[in-house]
Structures are given as structure tokens and as C-alpha cells.
UniProtKB/Swiss-Prot annotation:
Family from the record: Belongs to the engrailed homeobox family.
Any one GO molecular-function label of the UniProt entry: DNA-binding transcription factor activity, RNA polymerase II-specific
Gene: EN2
Gene Ontology CC: one annotated term: fibrillar center
Protein name: Homeobox protein engrailed-2
Lineage: Eukaryota, Metazoa, Chordata, Craniata, Vertebrata
Pfam families xref list: Engrail_1_C_sig, Homeodomain
GO biological process: axon guidance; central nervous system neuron differentiation; dopaminergic neuron differentiation; embryonic brain development; hindbrain development; midbrain development; negative regulation of neuron apoptotic process; negative regulation of transcription by RNA polymerase II
Compositional bias ranges of the Gly residues kind: 96-114
Amino acid sequence: MEEGGRSPREEAAEPQESGGDAEPGGGRRALLLPPGDPPHPHPHPHRITNFFIDNILRPEFGRRKEAGGTAGEPRRPGAESRRSPAAAAPAPGAPVPGGGGGGGGGSPGRGEGGPAALALHGAAKKGGDPAALEAALKARGLSGAELSVSSDSDSSQAGSNAGNQPMLWPAWVYCTRYSDRPSSGPRSRKPKKKNPNKEDKRPRTAFTAEQLQRLKAEFQTNRYLTEQRRQSLAQELGLNESQIKIWFQNKRAKIKKATGSKNSLAVHLMAQGLYNHSTTAKDGKSDSE
């Protein structure tokens, strides 16, 4: 038999001995693969990790063992806090926790922008060691610029989602004594003038003796003037209607304070203990006030 010729039994046994590692261009490799999948030039090597449920649930998962410590030695609670954050970053060749899932290497598209890369980024920022960050990112095939872009896009997406939600008002807005509407808000006081002008106040009316005598006589007749009677008095005394009206109001208030008589509503409220504003009359006031 010639050297180039092979029996069918040898050709069938050759793929089993090689374990499927034939060249990509060979016809035998193409026949073994499904028709839809292209041949992979460099398949990912199978990596054994400790990502079991029991290991993940342990408190020491993801922490590197302390130098000089044994597996059976109990961990001290203050030992982890004394280590620097830069020591938590893995070496360039070491496997990064969280990158692979339960089946080994994991997909590259899923692990590039995952939470493990963000955790590495934050740990290196706190530790202030950019070299450790770059080494860890290169081990995962990710650069710092891509990580920053992905984190910015995540933050912008979170901001847009928050903007779509209706704005919620805090509870204290609805508990104010001003109003239950948030649009009203707290009332602002008007600023007081430092130098009040005398023109802002209403000028006091200086009644003559004849005018006072006529007003007192009219008050004895009727304490409440009608509009026609007020107009006629204003024409007779040469005063404004507002001046006569204010004088009658002040006169009634003085008599009410002097006598101490209260209306029926005040008496009813005082009986219930809701009103007890006692007033005293002040002497020495002239009638011109």
C-alpha cells in the first residue's frame, strides 16, 4: 500500500486522537463543525474556577488571603480594614472574580461592562494606583476610556429614567400651616423700611373747637351716621367724609374700652375659655385723637 493512501478506519480514528484541534483550513475540521458556525481560530481554554454556590455565599469570597495566614486560621475583623484598597486589585495574570460565570471564561461582551469592572475602577480610584487599574483592565481586555464611557452612559440613562417619573414633593410641604398646595410655598415677609417717611403715615386731623363741639353733639344724638347725614356734616364743617367717619369710629372704640362691655360673642368665648383679652382704658387722651 502507498504512503499517501490511508484506510477509512485510520481517517475515522484521526479526529478522535487529535481531539478536534486540526487546522481551521482543513476539510476534516469543517466537516466536524455544524454548517452555521464558522471555525474558531483560537478557542478559549477551559478554566476551572471556584464559583460554586457554597463558595459565593461564604463571607471570605472574593478576598485574597492574607500573607502568612493559613486556611484554618480565623479571620480577624480588623485585618481586612487595615489593608490598603490598592492591594485588593488583582495581578495582571490573575483571574478576576465575577468575569466568568459558572462555566469558565464567560462571554467577553457580558463581562466588559459588568459590575466587576466598575468595582475595580472604584477600588483603584480610592487607592490612588492607576498602574494597578490599567493592569487589571488589560487583563479583561478593557481600557479606562471605555470604562468611563460605559459608566457615563449608565448614569445618563439613570438620569433620563428619573426625569420621566413625576416629581415627588417631600412630606413637609403638605404639613405647613400656610397651605397644602406645594405651589404656594412659605410666605415671605416684606422687608421693613429702615427710614420710614412721614408722608407714608396718614396725617392727623387737627379739629377746631367748633368742629369738636358739633361732632360731640351729633354723637350724643346718634352714634352711627347715615351716608346722607355724613355728607351734610362734611359740607357744614368743611371736612372730608372720611375724617368724620374715622372720628366716629375712634369715639365708639374709646367708649367701649372705658366701659369694658363686651359683645355676646366675646362673652360666649370667654365662658368656654377661648377668649380672655382684657383691655384697660388709657387716660389723658384728648378728643381730637
